Amino acid sequence: MARLVAVVKYSDEDYPFEKRQMPLYIDDSLTMVLEFSDNMLNLDKQQIDTVQLEQFIQHHKMLTEQDLTAALTVTSREVFNALSQLLPCVGCRRCVERLFSQVMQTGIQALDPLSVGANGVLTLSHSFMTDATKLYTLFYVCGSKLNSMIDTIAKNKKGKKNNRCKFHSLDVRKPKPLGGHWMDVWEVMSPECRDEVALIDSNCLLETLENYLQKHRFCADCKNKVHRAFNILTGELDFSKVKGYCANVYQGLRCCPHEGHIHLCCETDFIAHVLGRAEPEFAGGYERRERHAKTIDVAQEEVLTCLGIHLYERLHRIWLKLRAEVQTRQMLFYLGVDALRKSFEVTVEKVQGISRMDQYFKDILEEEKVQELKQEKKRQKKNRRKNKTSCDLPAPHETKSANASQNNDPPGFMESGGDSCNTSEDRNMCAEVTVKNEDLLRSHKMKKGLTPHSNVSDCGYSSSLEGSEPGSQEGSDVACAEGICKHDEAGDDEKDEEEGDSCVECWNNCTKDNIKGKSKKKKKKCKPFKCENENTLKQVPYNTESSDVHSNPNEENKVFNFCMDSEFPRRPWIYHRNEFFSDMSSSESQMRETKSLKELLDESECSSQEEDEITQDDIQAFKETYQTFYRDRQQFRQCLKENFKQFCLHRNPSLLVGKTGAIN
């Protein structure tokens, strides 16, 4: 707590202020010396964090003496910038700026251990620089009170619109009902200060008396009696010549006629008695009404009341100045400590090689790198999908060349590396055709879960290996032509095959070779389909209009005769199917050249990065471009089923009874 320890006389212009002392200006006639205690650094060990203190000591040892001196030096601009941001009260800001300028100009050590140089630089004393414990206590124990002090100032504002604190508002300058204020300021005064406060100037007291008489509208006679009582107090009138004078009323008062002073007894009880007479005046007990002083003793009491009013106003002014100056000094002290602490922390971080801001930016950059890495992985994944799609999609010219090669190849050509039919026994037509989904659907997309050669959805009549296994693998021309009937694997390779249809033999041998055939699915040889005629096969022209024959149920015999007519050599149904698709592809080649499915897919954009399917727009465009595809495909499938059924009934109707499930 600050104390008033001395009075500065006008003759003592160069008063020797000690550490933590500063002048307190009360009025034109009174200036006191305000002293602050140094017990702020004498703290209990429980208030100090041991772990944080050890860390601070390590940071303190990292700095050299030169670095420490530079770190514990801040300019006035840094202090004033923090001041304008933290303090809402205009009066507090002006008082802090005034005190900073006063300390800088006079050189007083009011902010010890802080000091302000002539150039306006705030620094710390050498004893605190070298002692890490004191420095820690100053920064993190005393300096932590800044926020609480600012909160206190904000709470003491007078009204929501008024940003001034209670010490700098206009209302506080008016005297209020007596309370403990005068006692608080009276107790922190030294005897010298009390004597100075108890010394009342006669002219000031007379001015207070005139205001009092005017306020209560005393009559002229009563005013004269009050003035006579005042003259007796000041020694201008001999009390022995005044009738009705009471000496007990002025007990404890002493006047100096030559100097014009009135001395009051400095005892606390007497001061309380004098102030007690003026309490009704501040509490509102006396209304503005006409008052009288008919006798001298009553006039003496009125003078004593005015003396109490004057003393209370003086004590209230001292209390207000004292509290405002203490708040100003503490605010400037805490602002300086906070600025030094920040400068010290910045210097320590620079010595360590990384600052908090750099660490923050580093964390942000790491997060951005992680996000970029994720985006790069997504782009690579998308590119892999796109490349895979491009590889799976056959080019238009490749499809053309493949169809042309199939049409130009000799009838006895084997695609998958089967044995050529060079012997006389095997001069019959041998053909192996691998029909893929790409050839049927003209698309690079496949159904999920199916291999490129899969036709599982063909209901047992598919030409692929996987599609025929669950359905009509045994006893069908398709299975025999595909090489999955396993005649060769059953041990019949050494026998010469008899003339006629080999599929009939498949029906007879399928039961025996069923188990052996299933164990050899990984490697299947192609067995040529023998035709009944050994003559060389001729190219049979096929027109797409023949699809009408397949679509007509009444012309099933014509279709059968077309395949088995004696004018033409016996041909496997695979051959007719190749001719069908070859002609159909040639008729639609011009349309595909206009815009292929690959071009449609390349033009379309994926709606999302994770899209794996063809969009509905692409499917709709494909259907509009190839309108005859599904119709011809269904007609061909129906024709194939009917041909196979008629073939089985014509050759061996008894076998069809037990194999109905395989056919259907």
Swiss-Prot record:
GO cellular component: cytoplasm; nucleus
Coarse class of the protein's main subcellular location: cytoplasm
Region (Disordered) location: 375-425, 447-476
Feature: compositional bias, Polar residues: 452-475
Disulfide bonds: none
GO biological process terms on file: cell differentiation; spermatogenesis
Source superkingdom: Eukaryota
Transmembrane segments: none
Keywords: Cytoplasm, Developmental protein, Differentiation, Spermatogenesis
Location in or out of the cell: Cytoplasm
InterPro entries noted in UniProt: GGNBP2
Residue ranges, compositional bias (Basic residues): 376-388
Function: May be involved in spermatogenesis.
PANTHER family listed in its UniProt record: GAMETOGENETIN-BINDING PROTEIN 2
Name of protein: Gametogenetin-binding protein 2
Organism encoding this protein: Xenopus laevis (African clawed frog)
Name of the gene encoding the protein in the UniProt record: ggnbp2
